[in-house]
Amino acid sequence: MYNMGTSNLLAYRHSLTMIKGFLFLVLMLFSLISRGQVEQDQTDTIESYLIAIDDLEAEYGAYSTQLSDLYLGLGKSYASKTEYFDALAAFQRGMQIERVNFGLHSLSQTPYLTSIADTESNLGNQEKSLKALNQAYQISVKNYGGTDKRMVPVINSLIDWHMNIYHQQRPKVGYSNLVMSERLADDMSFILDENIALNYPEGPTYYRRIADLHFVIANHITKHGEPRETGFTVSSGLDSRRRSEVRTSYRHFHRGKTALEKVIQASIEQENSTPYDQANVIADLGDWHLLFGQKLSAIKTYQLADEILDLDENPETARQSLFGSPKIIEFGIKKQNQDTTTMPSENESMSVQVSMLISEGGVASDFYLANESDSLTDNEMKLLKKYFSGKRFRPRIVERQPQEATHIVNYDRPAKGVEG
């Protein structure tokens, strides 16, 4: 076998490092050029809005109905440049024009109020942000009534807000946002059940949203426990608290399960619903059971989904898509990205292929790198194992039975400085 020699091997590794460094610098340069062009375009857009506003005010007055849209666009342009104080002033001016022209409780204020809420949140003014959203909510109640189906998107936006704040807070502080989100989800569920037909196109999405929220709450309780009130308590024993947390977690399992069953019912009632669509949401319910340790119920649910696929135009293709290989189970509500402008990092584009064994119960083990040329530090491997060991997978299903299977996934290296 050819032996490169120690000095040649070191030189080869050094050259690879130089090449990687050069490529990284090129990516940085392209990013900076692109960012500079975007910033110039944003500045030009702002100037265009300001000129249009001046012209319109000069011709039609300071409260022309056309001005509010221009102020909304101006505010969004300022926000895209993170010039939040200017954005806030533009949104508030646009809202004032709407109120003067259409009344204090006009629905046309809603996009301005939600934009104000987003901007106040970006400025760190969470109380003012929530106040703006509550104003939008009360205006909708005034116009529609508290249980009208048109309230569902409004409630959903409030849940979004609380979940974004939850992800920014320490667990103990953020729990109050989960409590508020659950109350809102209960209101949403009531409206969906009582006032909206099952064939409502957005119904499955909103019911799934409720399930996702209950997973977040149950997961929070599992990881951090329930907050204990200071002062008088009936019992402070560890066993008592654990029993309480188990009961609470089961409550959220049950409510999430109920919501997913509604997803199934609503999906069946949708126009042009296919067997694959129905099997897909039934499989999601199986995933839910598996996440909460209900393995037998999960298998029965997967089997039902598999039976539904017998009615599909291409049953084997559909089976391969849903059950041909393990799939990581994902429930929850993630933080919405406020700023999509990012600089490339040296680690960002580096990923590795990881092979693992997925058991019949969806548990991952036996991790190793599928590509021999890839490498991870001990700490990176520790983080990898911790990440995938904390996940559950939908198992491979063959002839309606779960099977142990090898699974290969792409895994992004953790950011530098992340500790296990």
PLM regions and their residue ranges:
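N-terminal signal peptide c-region/cleavage motif recognized by signal peptidases
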Residues: 31-33
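Helix-turn-helix repeat elements of alpha-solenoid scaffolds
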Residues: 40-52, 84-93, 126-135, 173-190, ...
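Charge-biased low-complexity segments
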Residues: 65, 118, 144, 160, ...
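Residue register of alpha-helical TPR repeats
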Residues: 69, 111, 150-153, 205, ...
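TPR/Sel1-like alpha-solenoid repeat signature
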Residues: 70-78, 90, 112-120, 132, ...
